Amino acid sequence: MAKFVFVTGGVVSSIGKGIVAASLGRLLKSRGYRVSILKLDPYLNVDPGTMSPFQHGEVFVTEDGAETDLDLGHYERFTDTAMSRLNSVTTGSVYQSVINKERRGDYNGGTVQVIPHITGEIRERIHRVAANSNADVVITEIGGTVGDIESLPYLEAIREFRGDVGRNDLAYVHVTLLPYIGTSGELKTKPTQHSVKELRSIGIQPDILVCRSDRPIDDELKAKIGGFCGVPTKAVVPSLDADSIYAVPIALEKGGLCRQVLDVLSLQDHESDMASWEALVQKLRNPGPAVKVALVGKYVQLNDAYLSVVEALRHACIHCDSALDLHWICAEQIEENGADGLLKGMDAVVVPGGFGNRGVDGKIAAIRWAREQRVPFLGLCLGMQTAVIEWARNTAGLVGATSAELEPATTHPVIHLLPEQQDVVDLGGTMRLGVYPCRLSPGSKAHELYGEEVVYERHRHRYEFNNAYRNLFLESGYEISGVSPDGRLVELIELKGHPYFLACQYHPEFLSRPGRPHPLFTGLIQAASQRLPQSPSEAISQRA
């Protein structure tokens, strides 16, 4: 039978609950426990699939095609365990389910209320993850901050959860902030005390406190916090600001988080094996020469919009003993100022996914620059589509060529709508989503990188390469190196004779892991590293 851990947050938003939950998952897995993590998001959207990246950040896609919160990406990367649509719960999806049940008559004419019906649905979702994941421990992160009105049904649900399982079968972990006041020269505990007081007023007494701070917490302060908040001093776990999110599990292990959780859950504290993770962090902190990578996007003002892409680049750099020198380039600035001025000196260019017209011409200009300057390039989703448009306009001479998404009346729709998408009306959850197989061409760069003939990748798109232009594409020096098993859909392209020019319709960033980087990103960083000076004299020559 599964045990349950609930992670709440107080004082401020974005305090790092997701990283704490993911880190705890890593620590439990290092002791041999099977783990699943789910996120309860208190917004009324059914899922984040139709939300603006500027408001929500990245949409992370699971194997089974759920569009979810970016925290699920952290869960997967830290635990190296695939999550599913069951691991993402929103207030919108909960209410939708309850209302659908009411319309079907499932409640036998009863009055439908927040308690017990909404809270009961939330509890059922948590139990469903436990039943379907075969996990020893299910960790649930509650979005928002204690005190928010939106989070109240979730907090009530996890309070009620005590009645579903034994007291030794669940633990409450509260993440809080200890702000430092410079004029008094001390960390302040009052916000934490009030946050715990608010949680207690709902009926939840935290078992463990994870205290964020920008400086060390001494034993005296831990004892004070524990005394005021009703937790043992040993259950006050410091969480000092870290130089990398991948260092957080190591810090929380030293602080005793996992041991305290296991103690509350009456589980055995097996020997932890974090050696490979610690080695990874050491490599991250002691990298080799830096590679300059330009990420050319539409949403660069909010870095979280491309979170998995950035993490995939980091994973590849760790593997290649390189430091990542990431340059955020707004595609619209390239439209205004030209590609050369913004991209000159870059060792690699990445064009990630996106939707809509804005910034597309800037992406196309960046791809042309990478092609002509022979700079390693990787295109993802829209990045592949814009690479095809760049080919059509500048190599094939197809005047006005573009995507039917961007200009439905174009005479050369080199990217067009998938046939099965023709009659789709709703935007949410209706794209080509989730894992699909891709057959690679023997002898291609992609086949060399993957080392396999068939790979499985995650998708999120409606538009695809138009096969009416396939022969012309192949005749102009390009190769279609990955297709769907039936050969109908173009999934991966590359340019022959170029140091590294690959673009895929799928999202390889979702499958990259710290200890298992994705081959397409590893190949990009390896190719970028080849551009670095190989000796001091070469470095002087280049600077000159």
UniProtKB/Swiss-Prot annotation:
CTP binds at residues 13, 148-150, 188-193, 224. One of its GO terms (biological process) is 'de novo' CTP biosynthetic process. The active site is at residues 381, 507, 509. Residues 292-534 form the Glutamine amidotransferase type-1 domain. Allosterically activated by GTP, when glutamine is the substrate; GTP has no effect on the reaction when ammonia is the substrate. The allosteric effector GTP functions by stabilizing the protein conformation that binds the tetrahedral intermediate(s) formed during glutamine hydrolysis. Inhibited by the product CTP, via allosteric rather than competitive inhibition. L-glutamine binds at residues 354, 382-385, 405, 462. The keyword Transcription regulation does not apply. Pfam families: CTP_synth_N, GATase. This is CTP synthase. It comes from Synechococcus sp. (strain RCC307). The lineage of its organism: Bacteria, Bacillati, Cyanobacteriota, Cyanophyceae, Synechococcales.
